[in-house]
Design a protein with these regions (language model features):
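Beta-rich, aromatic/charged-enriched effector core domains that present basic-aromatic interfaces
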Residues: 87-197, 373-376, 393
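N-terminal beta-strand-loop-alpha-helix module at the start
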Residues: 1-79, 432, 442-443, 447-451, ...
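Residues at alpha-helix caps and immediate loop-helix transition turns in enzyme cores, especially N-
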Residues: 24-28, 116-118, 353
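Glycine/tryptophan-enriched, flexible segments
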Residues: 146-291, 399-400, 404-458
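Active-site-proximal binding-pocket segments
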Residues: 11, 227-410
Length: 458
């Protein structure tokens, strides 16, 4: 506890650290510093940023060690990151008894628990919500002054209006060193794999991608066996790198390669889903397209478990699901393939897949995850049409032609001829588990079900 029994009289502000685990290019921190003499940084473990994170997950390990990195960075400036199991209201009220607190600064968010916390905080402290995203959802509107619902129009308007973004720069850090005892976080029971947490690592990855991969990104990005993507998503999820800074750097390279433009579009898809969740908050829980909120998905716990464990009999699906469980990450092309398989081959509710992904992914972001699942299922904003159904065999042959990716995650298929790896059921010998379903039969059923539903709900 604080040793001083008297309130320290000075103008302090609280930086509530949530999804911005970095010092540099952090608008929340910059605004706090502009209006305060010293900053008291706090991280509350009570909700662990979202309810799906558990101590066994790679996401928790990534967060835990990411906090350690931030803690060390703050200590270099003679400050202390308060890490507490208390809720934000209790710790804020306690600090207010010891310091003259001017305001609490925090990055804005869409999570329900965050919105409720802010409402309560405003009863006893001035709260400053800061937008660290690329897009200001309230000002980027169409010609009718309404929110965009089509990605291409959203992206076009954004690029026309934002050739760069404001981001904090050359900040002088001034942190308060409190005597508040930190609570001990549970030590992770898992590792963070290939994703080393922290701001320094995030910046190294970005610079490496920008120098070596971004110019061919449009050519290589879909191939599952190639290491051609930035793999910055975990760092963006926890704010270990500024999306404004990377956009501002990449937009300068826009005319040099289609790869740069394509990668910027992927960043903007992330922003688009956040934007949609702000303007249409119901879409976080329900289908964006309201007519599909009564769609008759099927329940099949056996199929769901087989999909989760990577035991569907389709090697491309199984390899992707093994990768997810082992690493906490999956290639974006893989995510679309397995999502299509769950919703349109197994006919299982997209929410089951979305929930499983959030439990497994290091980069599990609410808006992007829900947006991506609804897009593939054909029920979301600017979604793929219901009749777009990924053929797992064709996807396998196109994006992993020599089965390098598949055999990495399913090594028992290593010595099998490639044509049988993509379609093991064609072999006279039993070289792999039986497939759960026949894709063509499932596809026909899905098309019929969607057509029938649409005819009755126009």
């Amino acid at each position: 506890m604080v040793n001083d029994h008297q309130k320290i009289k000075n103008k302090f502000s609280i930086w509530w650290v949530r999804k911005d685990l970095r010092l540099n290019y952090n608008l929340t921190l910059e605004k706090a510093l502009q209006n305060s003499k010293q900053i008291i940084p706090i991280f509350t473990c009570e909700n662990k940023l979202n309810t799906n994170i558990n101590i066994n997950s790679k996401s928790y390990a990534f967060l835990y060690y990411g906090l350690k990195e931030l803690e060390k960075s703050i200590e270099k400036y003679s400050g202390k990151l308060i890490i507490t199991n208390s809720d934000i209201h209790s710790i804020t009220k306690y600090i207010q008894t010891k310091f003259e607190i001017k305001s609490l600064y925090v990055q804005n968010d869409i999570e329900d628990n965050f919105i409720n916390d802010i409402k309560q905080l405003k009863n006893h402290i001035n709260v400053e919500l800061v937008n660290n995203n690329l897009v200001d959802a309230q000002t980027l509107l169409n010609n009718s002054n309404k929110p965009f619902k089509v990605f291409s129009r959203f992206a076009k308007k954004f690029k026309e209006n934002y050739k760069s973004c404001d981001f904090a720069e050359n900040t002088v850090f001034k942190f308060a060193k409190t005597a508040i005892q930190n609570d001990n976080l549970p030590i992770p029971k898992n590792t963070f794999g290939e994703f080393t947490p922290g701001e320094n690592e995030a910046n190294k990855r970005f610079q490496n991608f920008k120098q070596n991969k971004i110019f061919t990104y449009h050519l290589d990005r879909d191939y599952l066996y190639k290491d051609s993507t930035s793999k910055l998503s975990p760092y963006l999820k926890y704010g270990m790198i500024s999306v404004r800074k990377i956009y501002s750097e990449c937009i300068k390279l826009m005319n040099q390669s289609k790869g740069v433009e394509k990668w910027i579009d992927e960043i903007l898809w992330r922003e688009f889903y956040i934007y949609i969740s702000i303007h249409f908050p119901d879409s976080i829980k329900y289908e964006f397209q309201e007519k599909y909120r009564k769609f008759p998905w099927e329940k099949n716990s056996n199929y769901l478990t087989k999909w989760q464990e990577g035991e569907t009999g389709y090697p491309i699906i199984d390899a992707c699901m093994k990768q997810l469980k082992e690493t906490g990450w999956m290639h974006n092309r893989g995510r679309m393939i397995v999502a299509s398989f769950l919703t349109k081959d197994l006919f299982i509710d997209w929410r089951e897949g979305e929930n499983w992904f959030m439990k497994q992914l290091i980069d599990g972001d609410t808006a992007s995850n829900i947006g991506g699942w609804q897009w593939t299922a054909g029920v979301g904003v600017d979604a793929a049409p219901y009749f777009r159904i990924f053929n797992p065999v064709l996807q396998s042959k196109k994006y992993d032609p020599k089965a390098k990716f598949i055999t990495k995650w399913l090594p028992k298929l290593k010595n099998i001829p490639v044509k049988y790896i993509h379609e093991p059921w064609l072999s006279e010998n039993k070289i792999y588990i039986d497939k759960l379903i026949d894709h063509q039969i499932s596809k026909n059923k899905t098309l019929q079900n969607f057509k029938s539903f649409n005819n009755h709900n126009e």
